[in-house]
Amino acid sequence: MHYPKVYDVIVIGGGHAGTEAALAAARMGRQTLLLTHNIETLGQMSCNPAIGGIGKSHLVREIDALGGAMALAADKGGIQFRILNSRKGAAVRATRAQADRVRYKAAIRETLENQANLDIFQQAADDLIVEGDTVKGVVTQMGIRFDAKTVVLTTGTFLGGVIHVGLEKSSGGRAGDPPSIALAQRLRELKLPVGRLKTGTPPRIDARSVDFSVMTPQPGDFPSPVMSFMGDVSMHPEQVNCYITHTNEKTHDIIRGGLDRSPMYTGVIEGVGPRYCPSIEDKIHRFSDKDSHQVFLEPEGLDTHELYPNGISTSLPFDVQFELVRSIRGMENAHILRPGYAIEYDYFNPQALKFTLETKAINGLYFAGQINGTTGYEEAGAQGLLAGLNAARRAWEQEEWTPKRDQAYMGVLVDDLITLGTKEPYRMFTSRAEYRLMLREDNADQRLTTIGRELGLVDDVRWAAYCEKMEAVERETSRLQHVWAAPNNPMGKKFVEMTGADLSKECSAIDLLKRPNINFGQIAELTGSEVSQQVGEQIEIAVKYEGYINRQHEDVAQLKRLEETKIPADFDYDVVSGLSREITQKLKTVRPETLAQASRIPGVTPAAVQLVMITIRKNNMTKKTA
């Protein structure tokens, strides 16, 4: 059947990348189709039941600032919230939400089903319709043809997916779901640069068989933080504890004894696993000097006894899993509900993508999520939103948009993937961002919401809330600049009494806030401020980090000069005098779009960038005089 409706955007896959891609395109007014193999698994958390964390929550906030769904779903489904790095600087603080899988998934599905311009259809996609070098649509498992101006692929671990438990293996996209074999074969036919990666998940445990009394409880923060700029604590369901226990030498001996049947250590798995989320057998091997490793027992939801033992991801045979779980303190009688497993899947070298996440080889075809070599819900959601918005803009022949490294962690993510490529699952960290003081979790809305409004991603309600917040920041900052404390006036005396600090001369409230040990809460009490915690936080950070932020702005100005120098798509690196063969080959492989991108390619020296710049200028001069 040839479906009668022609779509602007078709999104294949209903995971974290696919849902954000479909929602973004639909919010922008494009006729959008979301194809999923199973409507019941839309927004499913296939691995750990959590959103956020170091570097990751920055991405979630950016998705949220652009009108995305992930942060609000985390607020509606979160059963424990914590601020990580709370004693460190604002740049590296991160929010983490332990999520109820069912509630999170329900929140995502509700958002999808109530989004205008979005159709959902349950069918696996088996083929892409490509005419010349342009995608024209999709063919499903039943042979239904859907036509579209653009297609976004967000296939997760489903492309050629193989599940491993010990030396046993079976085809699967994840436990209980079939893989995407036909589509994987079709993509290989298109001569895109394909590789194999792997990820894994731990066995799930029945909480009724665990002795929590010998474990360390890990409560959430109080007052509870929120994930979304539009979130409220009233959205949160009941809050619960997680628990911490540890592996021991007995556990490690059991694991070592099973390595001869490990698919990782017998060469059965060829794909590379995530460096920063290693399996327990990998930890024992890589950190052989450690006597124990932490295990976090995380509830999977309020209406289930299922626990996620974070820290013991494994693909060892089930009998070894059984023994290693029962060797851990408090889990001596643990009942395993589901075995752990590893999954191996196809991914495509992201260096074959443009910065918009469109493939260089096929016009109108976009990739987002694990297909690009990343790991994590947050990384997937960020790519999905960018791919969806750019597919939407291309469909209407509008200029596409991708944030720069100084604008967003999304920009860092895309630039890293396309400039450096990846041979292992890529995870975001704050350390990857050179301008992280400007790219804080708390100011994602200030960086992106105005842009999102211009792109059509941000609705009236979010825009009004953002404008109200920024007006409040401006008003309160101005007020505090005109409130004065002096050694002999009542406010000055109150300040000294309250803080025990010295006050030798007249100071504005803003000047007092600049002091290292003074916080906005104290200034609010001193001056009778009634602004929200969010507004107070913005004022405090802006005041305390002003000098550092200004210095980063100067660094960004220098970078922008390089960013503004575009490298023509057909630039001939062979004619650049003085470039080594090695550097020439690297530049020809990556095909950087700007001098700034060229400077970030490993092995490309500043001198080489200068040579390219001189050649570009010579070419431009020649064209002008011709």
Swiss-Prot record:
One of its GO terms (molecular function) is flavin adenine dinucleotide binding. It is found in: Cytoplasm. NAD(+) binds at residues 273-287. GO terms for cellular component: cytosol. Gene3D superfamilies: FAD/NAD(P)-binding domain, GidA associated domain, C-terminal subdomain, tRNA uridine 5-carboxymethylaminomethyl modification enzyme MnmG/GidA. Keywords: Cytoplasm, FAD, Flavoprotein, NAD, tRNA processing. One of its GO terms (biological process) is tRNA wobble uridine modification. The keyword tRNA processing applies. FAD binds at G13, G14, G15, H16, A17, G18. Disulfide bonds: none annotated. Its cofactor is FAD. NAD-binding protein involved in the addition of a carboxymethylaminomethyl (cmnm) group at the wobble position (U34) of certain tRNAs, forming tRNA-cmnm(5)s(2)U34. Homodimer. Heterotetramer of two MnmE and two MnmG subunits. Belongs to the MnmG family. HAMAP family: MnmG_GidA. This is tRNA uridine 5-carboxymethylaminomethyl modification enzyme MnmG. It comes from Acinetobacter baumannii (strain AB307-0294). The lineage of its organism: Bacteria, Pseudomonadati, Pseudomonadota, Gammaproteobacteria, Moraxellales.
